[in-house]
């Protein structure tokens, strides 16, 4: 017999655990299951194993609202974050609802049956589970394959070529010369860690620079609040201080980009060797926050460069050679290991198909409602966190909204909710005002956002807080209906 749940959650990372906790807290009668394709929970924090893997957002906001992050260490390493997520699941009994090694292949909404049928692969076999509501918490990138461009001559290189998404556990890089291709968060994290791990020298090879900011590894305010305030009050203060700071610096960057650019350049110059060309190597052509700002805790990357253990080369690749990389300028970089920190491949729904009555949903024809539902797709929410703040802030709001919608439907006898596309009343805009490579490569396959609320995706926590947590649920863009289908519910 096909199992049926009130809610099926896809993904057991931060978003999935947040959704489960909110369901237990606010919709305690709802049955649910979490389907996780990997052998462990944790999502990103279970996948990436490269040296130095850490958060690039503060833990007071990357952590859950319901589980205080009690350390004053605001930037945490990957294993600590994985342990934190695992503890959150175990402490709240969420782990009992998680089915690992369950890969979702597709989800089909039936208007006639008024439910989702989710096709899952587990233990080499396919089976189906049905749900009244679907919560997609599978992130936004391809877990199987990172982005790696074609490099001429790659087969000629005598050393190892490694993508950080598939880091070998037994890699010995002590005493080796390493070239890291890329200048994003992964490269910025890797370089100091490789040096600390014994690499002879590391070169960051970038086609163009990235803005890099520096923050204390240990938050001085949190040190005091954690010492003198009760745990929950300290968490409240630390969290809201972090929210206010990140929001303010983002808004400042967008309104006064030249000021923010100058500030970042000055901060970098102070930490780098005398005569270092900061503009060439850390001065992008775009404005701050057109792409995500990278973080160097305690300025670790700058310190590594200053110590002579690492350097930066801004150039393009002509070809790989047997001993390294030849650049278009004619310079050659020798290397024992080349790491291609060249980014992600964007992928919504974890690669699963999304259909309605057996017909594929064309995402490019949909519009995001409050950044968490799609027009023309009933009884489904998708969690897509912030690009300019902690992912979890948005994940928590999405989880709250799911519960508000489910409770409203129960209270009023509805069983279907569907955002109605506004048509010509709202101009269609790109999914997000964000411009890194992985977004640009996927833009033609993404949903649209709208020119005004509730269709506009603003990447602003305070705007979303009002719109998602406090605005009324029963507004004209969200269509609630009754379609009672005879679904026999059984759940574990």
UniProtKB/Swiss-Prot annotation:
Catalytic activity: ethionamide + NADPH + O2 + H(+) = ethionamide S-oxide + NADP(+) + H2O
Cellular component, GO annotation: plasma membrane
GO molecular function (one): NADP binding
Subcellular location as annotated: Cell membrane
Broad class of where this protein is predominantly found: membrane
Cofactor: FAD
Pfam families referenced in this protein's UniProt entry, alphabetically: FMO-like (PF00743), NAD_binding_8 (PF13450)
Binding positions for FAD per the UniProt entry: 15, 36, 44-47, 56, 104
Highest taxon of source: Bacteria
Site (Transition state stabilizer): 292
Keyword list, A-Z: Cell membrane, FAD, Flavoprotein, Membrane, Monooxygenase, NADP, Oxidoreductase
Record's cofactor remark: Binds 1 FAD per subunit.
Enzyme Commission number: 1.14.13.-
Keyword Membrane included in the entry's annotation: yes
Induction remarks: Repressed by the transcriptional regulator EthR.
InterPro entries noted in UniProt: FAD-binding_MO (IPR051820), FAD/NAD-bd_sf (IPR036188), Flavin_mOase-like (IPR020946)
Chain positions recorded as NADP(+) binding sites: 54-56, 183-189, 207-208
Function noted in UniProt: Monooxygenase able to convert a wide range of ketones to the corresponding esters or lactones via a Baeyer-Villiger oxidation reaction. Can act on long-chain aliphatic ketones (2-hexanone to 2-dodecanone) and on aromatic ketones (phenylacetone and benzylacetone). Is also able to catalyze enantioselective sulfoxidation of methyl-p-tolylsulfide. In vivo, likely functions as a BVMO, but the exact nature of the physiological substrate(s) remains to be established. Is responsible for the activation of several thiocarbamide-containing pro-drugs, such as ethionamide (ETH), isoxyl (ISO) and thiacetazone (TAC), into reactive species.
Family of the protein in this entry: Belongs to the FAD-binding monooxygenase family.
Name of the protein: FAD-containing monooxygenase EthA
Organism this protein belongs to: Mycolicibacterium smegmatis (strain ATCC 700084 / mc(2)155) (Mycobacterium smegmatis)
């Amino acid at each position: 017999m096909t199992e049926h749940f009130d809610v099926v959650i896809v993904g057991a990372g931060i978003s999935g655990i947040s959704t489960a906790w909110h369901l237990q807290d606010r919709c305690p009668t709802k049955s649910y299951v979490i389907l996780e394709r990997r052998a462990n929970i944790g999502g990103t924090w279970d996948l990436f194993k490269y040296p130095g893997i850490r958060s690039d957002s503060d833990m007071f906001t990357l952590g859950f609202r319901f589980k205080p992050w009690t350390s004053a260490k605001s930037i945490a390493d990957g294993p600590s974050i994985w342990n934190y997520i695992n503890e959150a699941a175990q402490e709240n009994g969420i782990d009992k609802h998680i089915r690992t090694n369950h890969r979702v292949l597709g989800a089909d909404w039936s208007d006639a049956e008024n439910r989702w049928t989710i096709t899952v692969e587990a233990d080499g076999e396919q089976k189906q589970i049905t749900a009244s509501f679907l919560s997609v918490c599978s992130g936004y990138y391809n877990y199987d394959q990172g982005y790696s461009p074609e490099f001429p001559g790659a087969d000629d290189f005598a050393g190892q070529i490694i993508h950080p998404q598939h880091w070998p556990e037994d890699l010995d890089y002590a005493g080796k010369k390493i070239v890291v291709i890329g200048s994003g968060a992964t490269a910025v994290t890797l370089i100091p860690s490789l040096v600390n791990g014994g690499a002879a020298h590391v070169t960051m090879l970038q086609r163009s620079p990235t803005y890099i900011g520096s923050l204390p590894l240990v938050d001085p305010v949190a040190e005091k609040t954690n010492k003198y305030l009760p745990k929950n009050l300290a968490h409240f203060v630390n969290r809201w201080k972090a929210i206010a700071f990140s929001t303010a610096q983002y808004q400042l960057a967008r309104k006064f980009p030249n000021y923010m650019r100058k500030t970042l350049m000055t901060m970098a110059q102070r930490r780098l060797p005398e005569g270092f060309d900061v503009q060439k190597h850390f001065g992008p052509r775009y404005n701050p926050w057109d792409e995500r700002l990278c973080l160097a805790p305690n300025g670790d990357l700058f310190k590594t460069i200053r110590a002579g253990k690492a350097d930066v080369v801004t150039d393009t690749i002509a070809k790989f050679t047997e001993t390294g990389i030849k650049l278009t300028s004619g310079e050659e970089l020798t290397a024992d290991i080349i790491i291609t920190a060249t980014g992600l491949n964007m992928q919504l729904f974890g690669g699963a198909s999304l259909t309605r009555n057996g017909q594929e949903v064309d995402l490019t024809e949909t519009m995001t409602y409050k950044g968490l539902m799609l027009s023309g797709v009933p009884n489904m929410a998708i969690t897509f966190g912030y690009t300019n703040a902690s992912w979890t802030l948005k994940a928590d709001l999405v989880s709250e909204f799911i519960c508000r919608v489910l409770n409203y439907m129960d209270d009023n006898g509805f069983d279907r909710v569907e955002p109605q596309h506004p048509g010509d009343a709202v101009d269609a805009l790109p999914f997000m005002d964000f411009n890194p490579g992985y977004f640009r490569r996927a833009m033609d396959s993404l949903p649209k956002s709208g020119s005004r609320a509730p269709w506009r995706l603003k990447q602003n926590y305070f705007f979303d807080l009002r719109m998602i947590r406090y605005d009324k649920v029963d507004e004209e863009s969200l269509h609630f209906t009754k379609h009672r289908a005879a679904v026999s519910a059984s759940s574990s």
